[in-house]
Amino acid sequence: MPIINGQKMACGPCIRGHRSTKCNHYNERVMVPVRKPGRPLSTCPCPPGKPCVCGGVRVAIPKKQKCHCPAGTVDSATSSEFDPSPVDTPISPASRTSSNRVTKSGSGSKSASRRQSLALANLERMDPNSINLIPSPNGNGMIGITAMVSPRDATFGHPMGMVPMGPRESFVPAPPPDFGGPMGYNMPPSMPPHMPPPHYPPHIQIPQHIKTENGGFVPMLNGTFVSPVPIPAFVDGPHPQGMQAFNGPPPPPPSNPVLEPSAMSKPKGGSGGGGCCGGGKKAPQIQAPPPVPAPLPTPPQQQMPNIMPPPQPQNAPSGGGGSCCSSKSSQPPPMPQMSPNAMQAPPQPGFGQGFMPQYQTPIDIKMENMHHHQPFQFPGQTVFTYPAEYGSWQMPINPAIWQQVVSRPPTQQQHETPISATAPNGNNGTVGGNSHECGCGEGCQCVGCLAHPFNSQMLQYVQNAYSPNSSHGNSGSADSSANASPSANPLNLASPVEIPSGPELPPSHQTQPQPPPRPNANESDGSSNAPTPPNEGSPALSNEEELTALDYYFVHLPISALCGGALDMCPCDESCECVGCLVHNTAGFPQGDGGFS
């Protein structure tokens, strides 16, 4: 039996099953205090003038237990494991003894064998001639692309898959397609007869064994005509040099920059005019390629401004040295021409700079809302953090503390603690406080959930553990009340005051349920009924195990039905002057104690 801070505790199922002395679930379940053997008290043993603490139980929630808050995937997995499947029913013993079940299983095996006949391995045994192929609606085999329509498609015979079936045969092989005459007489109107065949680049050649008709179409076996190469944009002649970038490798530009240093070195030799003329002669060779690739935004285009300056000396051949200087001075003007293209790069960082504040603004607003507005106000709150001093043996969590944590706006310290505690699941003890993460929401009914410790299932868990005692206590209270004298109640009420441990109750009287088992005078009266309580037995002292209170969270549950006697109540109104009244005249009760005695 676990003993936590001198209090014997056990789980609820072990208390109900009279196994509290053998309980070893101190790391798995919520621990409930075990009452001492004997009949419960017929009256409230709390001292007069003090709040009744009999209506509450201090339970211990293990910190090492797994979080019982269910997840969607875990529930589906566990439910699928325990739900009986139809495959398991024939294996049950009843199905083996019943003849009908055996026949059903046999029929099921036959159906399974029939299904296996459709396996991929059985497709190899099928006759290819008996397979009926259905072409696509567009005749091309690709979705969304229309096929080429030819005027002779109707004379090619029935397409594959559209073969009429005979009266006795289910599959009829398709007849060979009829290709008809040459395609030259049936050219489409879009290509006139006088148009010469297209000229393809030398790197694109048609194989010799393929016979081409007019227009470059090749007849295929299925009755269609396909072009071996894509029809170029220029059909009536060779492509210009500017389009070679699309049909072949670009012209080698590195040869031109090599000539520029030689041309620039000639003016330094003394013949300035020859250098300029030489640059002018080589300039027309360089002027041809630039105009065509100019609109293309490719990297070679950026190298073209370096080649453009040589034509400028051609306009001023009089001064060789001046022309070279003018060419160098004229090189900067083409660079501003490239500035519009270069200005395309700054908008990208500008867009990024404009986008990042838009992304950072919601974060700042969200953090301000988290500081000024309590996260618990949102219905999706999953983390609850208690101060470090709460949840201990001396200061257990009670409904007032729980409501305070829920309704109080968070401080900066409380706001930082949930962040460090959100990584792991379950109960987490941090330096700043105790936190628990629960994904069930406000309707959580998990037993031992630190975020919702006062749910109905938690209260029912404790009430079920004490239900046998309460039933016997009600029957015993009727007998004791009949045999007890009026002066016995004040004595029993005042007896806890004379106990030396009485002064220790005020600091923690709201949370400690130790006073009920304190009065030992009644234990002798209830010794005859010792076998009645099912909770604790004296001989099992070897099974007791001392546990530290640091491994548990303590919660005080307000359960009023656990009090053995009647709670503090008075039928009078506020003007009550009854001597010894525990509600209205608590100050005069010690004076009347002597009269009762």
Swiss-Prot record:
One of its GO terms (biological process) is positive regulation of transcription by RNA polymerase II. Copper-sensing transcription factor that regulates copper uptake by transactivation of Ctr3, a high affinity copper permease. Binds to the palindromic UAS sequence 5'-TGTTGCTCANNNNAGAGCAACT-3'. Also transactivates Sod2, a mitochondrial manganese superoxide dismutase through the palindromic UAS sequence 5'-GTTTGCTCA-3' with 352 bp separating the two inverted repeats. Loss of function indirectly leads to rearrangement of mitochondrial DNA associated with senescence in wild-type strains. Residues 1-41 bind DNA. Residues 104-115, 469-495 have a biased composition (Low complexity). InterPro entries: Copper_Homeo_Regul, Cu_fist_DNA-bd_dom, Cu_fist_DNA-bd_dom_sf. One of its GO terms (cellular component) is nucleus. It comes from Podospora anserina. Zn(2+) binds at C11, C14, C23, H25. This is Protein GRISEA. The lineage of its organism: Eukaryota, Fungi, Dikarya, Ascomycota, Pezizomycotina. Keywords: Activator, Copper, DNA-binding, Metal-binding, Nucleus, Transcription, Transcription regulation, Zinc.
